[in-house]
């Protein structure tokens, strides 16, 4: 029995995806998660054969969730399900080892075809995007490894730095001491191999 995890914070879309997959691939066992923490918990405690991941859900509003999961579960087949048509972003998604990109506008048959192809070990992209997406984005792949080493708390601090907040403001938003924020910033700089906030902002901007 093949078990698939749908990770998306929109219950209506999860229901629609579940319905489409149940009709086309009735042998699948389907699990659901609505945020990054729940997704990681399920992956830690259950045998999942394929993860269908939305990039934008609580715990991750950009590529961090994908990078975090790829770091924790490097052997897990992952496909991103998203409404974006940004080929640069899709190229980044594929470059970090993701096996597929499924548009949220895809038909039930296309979704089933994608799942079957990915379970067979193939990379699946929609026909209209396959020629435009550069699968070998080595520069971003190297950056992704560094970003994936951040903890979720460090990632939140990095996002606030990207938004231009000072340490005191970040501490207020996260309800932590300013000294703790400074410790996170130091760790972020070390893990990313940088030495100032401007460089951190440039890196964070590439995750959007």
Explain the meaning of each model-derived region.
Residues 63-75:
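Short amphipathic alpha-helix used as the core "switch/output" element in two-component signaling
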Residues 186-208:
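Basic, Lys/Arg-enriched C-terminal extension of HTH/homeodomain DNA-binding domains
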Residues 58-61:
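The feature encodes the CheY-like receiver
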Residues 54-55, 82:
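Active-site residues of response regulator receiver
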Residues 32-50, 64:
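Acidic, metal-coordinating helix/loop segments flanking the phosphotransfer/catalytic sites
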Residues 141-178:
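Helix-turn-helix DNA-binding segment
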Residues 9, 81-85, 104-106:
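Conserved active-site segment of CheY-like receiver
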Residues 90-94, 100-147:
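Short, flexible helix-to-coil linker/hinge segments that flank and couple to helix-turn-helix
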